[in-house]
Amino acid sequence: MRLRLLAVCGLAFIVLTAIAQEKKDPVPPAKGDAPKTEAPKAEAPKKDAPKVDAPKVDAPKVDAPKTPDPKAPAPAGDNPLAWKFTKDVPFYQEMTTTTTQNIKVQGLDVGQNQQQTFYFSFLPIKQDGDKWIVKQTIEGVKMKIDIAGSPVSYDSTNEAAAGGTNTALSEFFKAIKGSQFTLTLLKDGTVEKVEGRDEFVKKLTQSNKQLEALLNKILSEEAIKQMADPTFGVTPKEVKKEKESWPRTVKLSLGPLGSYENTYTFTYAKQTGDIADIDVKVGLKYTPPGPDTAGETLPFKIKAGTITQVADEKTNKGTVKFNTKSGRIESSKIDIKMSGSLTLDIGGTTTEVTLTQDQSTEVKTSDKSFVPDKKQ
């Protein structure tokens, strides 16, 4: 961490020498005819020079050390791309994911468009060495899903206007609002531990107990950690110069849905004022679930599958804008395009499915909540 240094000034003293002054007095002549003789000159008694006090020299003023501002961000060392936190001072994020998916199954083309927006608050509550304890709250959620012409929508900021035909899905999103997690963050932004996962799953399954087994597999502790990755997982472990890169690999197991391994390559592209541009390239690898993975919680079972990225200059990459003064992400946008095929077992019948998917995720950060005022 950066240290504040206090300069200490020494005092210089001036020593003055005393000046001696000699004084001679005449001796009166003696009486009688005696020849006059000059009395020997008597030396004037030496007088000590008066003591002269050295002039007082005022010590130079030394400012008292400044008391650290409790509202100032905690220093993050020499790494300009490191996160900074201020105890009890929250910050807020809006994360919007837009997905366009086309699925072809049994000769039918099924289109699906969805947009999900999550409103988060983050409250740093304690620093423990190089670690920070941060409380994350889902302040609100908004979603629009259209599956083959059947729309579903939910907006926690305007629940009265929620529409669509699938109220079960709306109830699922409604349960998400207000959920809290306690994150333990390492110095490089890695989420070491998450508390609140069990309460989260319990809350989501209150209205549908059949989802409990599935969500316990999909929403593992590791999966919950990855929920915070778009926020904290972009900064390097060591100091980087402009044009230098660093990798980050994220593995995510989704139980009966298989697993993903995402490899991110970050590059410190440039610095403009307080804003650092970080370029991102994304590599994706999908692995279908193993044969021993239970799939009874789903209406189908994935027997095999291949999902790869589509080579496109405009996708599978993005940009993160990091504010080096405040020590946090200002904004980010990452686009991913993929295609593939899955072999499904549906009620004992093998079905081939092909799909393409475009996905874009945007994150914004602010000192104020992004949750809009509730509509009257």
Q: Across the structure, where does each feature detected by a protein language model lie?
A:
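Sec-dependent N-terminal signal peptides
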Residues: 1-22
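Low-complexity intrinsically disordered segments
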Residues: 11-14, 34, 64
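Low-complexity, polybasic segments enriched for Lys interleaved with small residues
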Residues: 39, 44-45, 49
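Signature of exported/secreted
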Residues: 24-28, 47-376
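D/E-rich low-complexity acidic segments and tails
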Residues: 24, 34-40
